Design a protein with these regions (language model features):
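Juxta-kinase regulatory segment immediately upstream of eukaryotic protein kinase catalytic domains
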Residues: 457-480
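Active-site acidic catalytic loop and adjacent metal/ATP-binding pocket
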Residues: 482-496, 606, 644, 698-788
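ATP-dependent phospho-/nucleotidyl transfer catalytic cores
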Residues: 622-631, 658-733
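Intrinsically disordered, low-complexity domain-flanking/linker segments in eukaryotic proteins
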Residues: 359-361, 365-381, 546-598, 657-664, ...
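ATP-binding pocket architecture of kinase catalytic cores
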Residues: 480-675
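N-terminal accessory scaffold of Fe(II)-dependent oxygenases
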Residues: 2-281, 291-458, 463
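Active-site activation/catalytic loop segments of kinase-like enzymes and analogous catalytic loops
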Residues: 785-824, 842-862
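ATP/Mg2+ or Mg2+-diphosphate-binding catalytic cores
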Residues: 846-890
Length: 890
C-alpha cells in the first residue's frame, strides 16, 4: 500500500491529469493539490492542508534521479567553448554573405535601444501585465492560459522536472503595448509572409517567459523558416545541429499520409553549443535542429520569418509528399527503402562552425564520430549504404535546394494531393501567398517562380495554359498573369478577359463528369430560356488537355458524344455512352454511387474557358458594403437560386441499383445516389464527426446517431394522410458551392449607392445590385436546402436578417412534388419534414466541416447538450418560412 501511495502521489502523474483538463490555471503549490482543486474533489481545508506522508525503507533510484532533476540548480553553469561566433554591428550585406542560410550566430547590440531592456524585468512585467492572461506551452493538446501574476507565483513555488513556460503567439492581441517595446532588428526585417493579412499568416512571433530548467526539446522550426531570438533577462543554453544531422535519441516522424519516415538517428555527434546572455540575439537558420535550456528565469521574444535565403526551402516544404520533408530534416537517412549501416570505431567529437565554406567532408551524412574543421577523411565517420541505387550510393548530403528537390515525388501534384497538417499555412492560403508576392514584389519574380514551381507545380500548369491558349487563339498572358489565381481547388488563370480553368481535383473520372454535367446544365439553361444565363459566365471553349510523348495537346469537346481520347486513356464503362451528354448529370450520379476512386494519375485534364465576369468577388468587398447593400445582395441571391432550383432535370435515364442495402427498390431512381451517400455517412457518423478534430462537442457526437432518422430516405419521403401512400419530393439542381468567393457583385454606376432606390420588380433589383454566380463544377441534385447551408453560414455569416431577405425573394417551397397539395398534407404530421430538422441533418452529414462554422458563429452552442438546441437556434426561421411559403401549381 505504501508503494502504491508513493507512486500515486507522483507529481508528473497529477500534472498530466491536470493538463488533460485544460482551462485557466492557478497553481496551488503542487500538481496534486492543483488538480484536486480544479476538479472540485476536495475542500480548501481538507486534503490540501494535509502534511505529506513519509515511509521508511523504500528506495528507488529512478524516483531519486527524477527528484534530483527537479531540485538541481543551473544558475552556476557557465560553460561556453565558443562554438557559435559572437558578432557586433553586423551590416546587412555581411550578415547575408556570411551567416544567412549558412549557420547560427550570436549578435550583440541589436536590442540596446529597446524599451524592453528595462521594462521586461519580471517585477515590471507583473506590475504592468499581472492581470493579463497568456498561453502556456505544454505537451497536452488542451489550451492552458494563465494570468501573468499567477504564472510568476507558479515559477516561485514549482519544482517540476520539465516546468511550464509562457510561449504565447497571441501576446500582441492580449497585451498590444508589448509590441511597442521592441522592434524587429534590421537584419531580419525582410519577411515574405507579411504580404498576407494578419489572420491569414501563420504564427510568427512569441513572447517567452520560463524558469530555470524549462526550455524546448530538439526541433526544427516550422515550415523550414529561420528565426531570431532576443533574450532580455536571464541566460539560455543553446545546442544546435545543422540540417540533415538528427540529434542522438531523436526520432523524426514523417508519414506518407500526412507528411509529418520514422527515422531513429544513429548519430552521436556533439552539437554546437553556446550560452546566450541578456541583450544578445541568436540567429537560427532554416532547417537547423536546436534545443534550449533556461539556466535562470528568462524573458525573451522570438520571431520566425521567410526571406530570400530560405524562401525556396519553405516552398519545397509545402510540396506534396513526405520523402523530401524527411531528407530536409534527417538527411539521406530519410530516403525510403534505404538502410544505413554506421561504421563505428571513431571517437565522438564536436561539430565546428565553418559557415563560409562547408567542405564536402563536413557535408557528408555521418554517424558516431566527429566532424572537425578539416578536410581529412580519416577524421570523419562515414556510412555504408546497402541496397542504394547507384544515383545515391556516393551522394553527399547538402542543404542546397537543387539537391533537396531531387527527392520530390514527381507523381504527386499540389492540386490532387493531401495537404500536410504540418505545413505552416493552408493549401489555399499558400496559393494566395505566392500570388500576392508575384503582384507586390515584381523585383523577386525570378525567385518566386522557382518557389511556385516547387510548391504548386506552376511550371506544369503554365505549360497547360499555353497549349489551351494556342488552341483557341487566346491572347498571350502578361507577366502579371502567369500565376494561378483564386483559392479554389483547381488551377485557374485569368488572361486578358478570359478565365481558363483546368480541372484536376478528384482525378479524371470526377473532373470529366464535372465538366460534362456543367456543359449539360448550360445547354438546359439555353433551351428553357432561363434568366439565370445573364448571371453566370459565358463559356468560350471546353475540352481535354492530354500529355503524351512529352508534349501537351488539346482535344476540344462541348459535352456531346464520347471523346475518343477518354476511350484511349480512361475507358469508362458508362450506361449513357450513347446519350446526348454521356458524362452528364445521370452518369455523374452513377459514378458517385459506384464510389470508384482514381487508382492513378492519368495524363489528361478537362478544361473550360469562360468570359471574365465584371464585378468584385463578394469575399473581397463584403466588409465595404453597408447592411442595406447586403440585404439587396441577399434578395438578388434569392432570385437566382430560385432560377437554379426551378431548372428542369435532364431526361431521366434508368439508373443501375446502388450496392447500399439501405436504399430501397421503391425509392425514386433520381434520389438513390443521394440516399446512398447519406446512409453511408450515417453508418459511420461518430468517425465522420471525429474527423473534424474537436470541432463538435463530445456530448453531441454521442447523440448524433440517435438524432438522425433511421432511414435517410425519410427526409424526402412522407406518408400521405388517409390511404397511407408514400409521397416523394422532387430533387433540384444543386450548385453545392455557393460561397462568398463564388459570388460576384456589381454596382450600377449610374444608380450611385445600392441603397438609393427601392426596387419595384425583378428588373430593377438586378439593375440595382447585379450579382453573378460562378464555378458550377460541383453541380449535383438533391434537396434545395443543401444550397442554403453554405449561403447562411458562409455568405450571410448567420445573419438572420439576410436569411429572411433571401427567403423573401426565393419564394419557392422547400418541398415540391407531383402534387404539392399531397406534399403539404403529408408533412403536417412528419417530424422529418420540418425544414430546420432536415437542414440540421444535412449539416451533420455534410462532407465539409460546416459544423465548425456553426460553433464558430454561435459560440454559446459549444455548451449545447442536444442537437435540438443547435437546430432551433440556427435554423428555426426556416420553419416559419415553410409554414407560410407559397405552393407551386402542380
Amino acid at each position: 500500500c505504501s508503494v502504491m501511495y508513493i507512486l500515486c502521489n507522483e507529481e508528473p502523474l497529477w500534472m498530466s491529469k491536470y493538463l488533460s483538463v485544460g482551462g485557466h490555471f492557478e497553481y496551488k503549490g503542487s500538481w496534486k493539490k492543483t488538480t484536486l482543486s480544479r476538479l472540485n474533489l476536495c475542500s480548501e481545508n481538507s486534503e490540501l492542508e494535509q502534511k505529506a506522508r513519509h515511509f521508511d525503507g523504500f528506495n528507488s533510484l529512478y524516483l531519486y534521479r527524477r527528484w534530483y532533476r527537479c531540485f538541481t540548480t543551473l544558475s552556476s553553469y557557465s560553460f561556453d567553448n565558443g562554438h557559435v561566433e559572437r558578432k557586433d554591428d553586423l551590416s546587412l550585406d555581411h550578415f547575408r554573405s556570411q551567416y544567412d542560410g549558412k549557420g547560427p550566430v550570436l549578435l550583440g547590440k541589436l536590442a540596446e535601444s529597446w524599451p524592453a531592456r528595462t521594462k521586461w524585468s519580471m517585477q515590471q512585467l507583473v506590475h504592468d501585465y499581472g492581470e493579463v492572461t497568456f498561453r502556456i506551452s505544454q505537451r497536452s493538446p488542451k489550451k492552458i492560459i494563465m494570468k501573468l501574476k499567477d504564472y510568476v507565483s507558479y515559477m516561485e513555488l514549482q519544482h517540476d522536472e520539465d516546468p511550464l513556460y509562457i510561449f504565447d503567439d497571441k501576446f500582441g492581441e492580449s497585451a498590444p503595448a508589448l509590441l511597442e517595446d521592441y522592434r524587429v532588428p534590421h537584419l531580419f526585417q525582410e519577411d515574405l509572409f507579411d504580404v498576407l493579412d494578419y489572420e491569414q499568416r501563420p504564427a510568427f512571433r512569441w513572447f517567452i517567459i520560463g524558469p530555470e530548467r524549462s526550455g524546448a526539446s530538439w526541433h526544427v522550426d516550422p515550415g523550414l523558416t529561420s528565426a531570431w531570438n532576443t533574450l532580455l533577462c536571464g541566460r539560455k543554453r543553446w545546442a544546435l545541429y545543422p540540417p540533415g544531422r538528427v540529434p542522438g535519441g531523436v526520432t523524426v516522424h514523417v508519414s506518407a499520409e500526412d507528411g509529418d519516415v520514422d527515422i531513429e538517428t544513429p548519430t552521436s555527434l556533439q552539437p554546437l553549443e553556446c550560452t546566450q546572455l541578456p541583450g544578445e540575439t541568436i540567429f537560427v537558420p532554416s532547417g537547423w535542429w536546436h534545443c534550449v535550456l533556461n539556466l535562470e528565469t528568462t524573458v525573451a521574444v522570438t520571431q520566425n520569418f521567410v526571406n530570400q535565403s530560405n524562401f525556396e526551402h519553405v516552398c519545397l516544404d509545402m510540396a506534396p509528399g513526405h520523402c523530401h520533408k524527411g531528407v530536409c530534416r534527417a538527411g539521406l537517412l530519410a530516403v525510403p527503402g534505404k538502410s544505413v549501416r554506421d561504421i563505428e570505431n571513431h571517437p565522438p567529437g564536436t561539430i565546428t562552425s565553418n559557415h563560409n565554406d562547408m567542405t564536402c567532408t563536413e557535408e557528408r551524412l555521418k554517424g558516431s564520430g566527429s566532424v572537425r574543421d578539416s578536410n581529412s577523411e580519416s577524421q570523419c565517420s562515414s556510412f555504408e549504404f546497402s541496397d542504394v541505387d547507384k544515383s545515391l550510393e556516393n551522394q553527399v548530403f547538402s542543404y542546397d535546394i537543387g539537391f533537396l528537390s531531387q527527392f520530390l515525388e514527381k507523381e504527386k501534384d499540389h492540386y490532387t494531393s493531401v495537404w500536410s497538417p504540418t505545413n505552416p499555412i493552408g493549401q489555399r492560403e499558400a496559393r494566395e501567398w505566392l500570388r500576392r508576392l508575384w503582384v507586390l514584389k515584381p523585383e523577386l519574380r525570378g525567385l518566386i517562380w522557382k518557389g511556385a514551381c516547387l510548391a504548386i507545380n506552376v511550371d506544369k500548369w503554365y505549360a497547360c495554359l499555353e497549349e489551351i491558349r494556342a488552341c483557341h487563339s487566346l491572347p498571350a498572358p502578361s507577366e502579371d498573369e502567369k500565376l494561378p489565381v483564386g483559392t479554389g481547388s483547381n488551377p485557374v488563370f485569368i488572361v486578358s478577359d478570359n478565365v481558363i480553368k483546368i480541372n484536376a481535383e478528384g482525378g479524371l473520372g470526377y473532373s470529366a463528369h464535372g465538366l460534362g454535367t456543367e456543359l449539360e446544365f448550360y445547354d438546359l439553361l439555353r433551351k428553357v430560356g432561363s434568366p439565370l444565363v445573364n448571371h453566370i459566365p459565358e463559356i468560350i471553349a471546353s475540352g481535354f488537355l492530354v500529355y503524351e510523348d512529352g508534349v501537351y495537346r488539346t482535344v476540344p469537346w462541348n459535352g456531346k458524344g464520347m471523346p475518343d481520347v477518354l476511350a484511349k486513356y480512361y475507358p469508362l464503362e458508362l450506361s449513357y455512352a450513347n446519350s446526348c451528354f454521356p458524362l452528364g448529370l445521370w452518369s455523374k450520379q452513377q459514378f458517385g454511387m459506384d464510389g470508384s476512386a482514381e487508382s492513378s494519375n492519368r495524363p489528361i485534364w478537362p478544361y473550360m474557358v469562360t468570359r471574365k465576369c465584371k464585378g468584385d468577388i463578394f469575399a473581397h468587398v463584403r466588409d465595404t458594403l453597408s447592411k442595406a447593400d447586403l440585404l439587396n445582395l441577399a434578395s438578388s441571391l434569392g432570385v437566382q437560386m430560385r432560377n437554379i432550383h426551378l431548372l428542369p432535370l435532364p431526361h431521366e435515364e434508368s439508373l443501375p441499383e446502388p450496392e447500399d442495402n439501405n436504399v430501397k427498390d421503391s425509392d425514386p431512381p433520381e434520389w438513390k445516389q443521394v440516399i446512398s451517400t447519406l446512409n453511408r455517412r450515417k453508418n459511420n457518423i461518430k468517425k465522420h464527426l471525429a474527423n473534424w478534430g474537436g470541432t463538435v462537442p463530445t456530448v453531441l457526437i454521442e447523440k448524433a446517431e440517435e438524432y438522425l432518422p433511421p432511414d435517410m430516405s425519410s427526409l424526402i419521403k412522407f406518408v400521405k394522410d388517409g390511404d397511407g401512400d408514400s409521397v416523394y419530393t422532387f430533387p433540384s439542381w444543386i450548385h453545392s458551392d455557393i460561397m462568398d468567393d463564388n459570388i460576384l457583385t456589381q454596382r450600377a454606376p449610374e444608380m450611385g449607392s445600392l441603397t438609393d432606390t427601392k426596387s419595384t420588380g425583378d428588373g430593377d433589383l438586378e439593375k440595382l445590385n447585379e450579382i453573378l454566380i460562378i464555378d458550377f463544377s460541383d453541380l449535383s441534385i438533391g434537396d434545395p436546402l443543401c444550397d442554403l447551408i453554405p449561403l447562411h453560414l458562409d455568405v450571410f455569416r448567420g445573419d438572420i436578417d439576410l436569411l429572411r431577405e433571401y427567403l423573401g425573394s426565393y419564394q419557392l417551397p422547400f418541398l415540391r412534388g407531383k402534387s404539392n397539395d399531397d406534399i403539404y398534407k403529408s408533412v403536417q404530421n412528419s417530424k422529418f419534414s420540418t425544414a430546420s430538422y432536415r437542414a440540421m441533418c444535412y449539416c451533420i452529414l455534410h462532407d465539409d466541416n460546416v459544423l465548425a462554422a456553426i460553433f464558430g458563429l454561435w459560440k454559446e452552442l459549444r455548451n449545447a447538450t442536444s442537437w435540438e438546441e443547435v437546430e432551433h437556434l440556427v435554423w428555426d426561421d426556416l420553419n416559419r418560412y415553410q409554414q407560410s411559403s407559397p405552393t407551386l401549381s402542380s
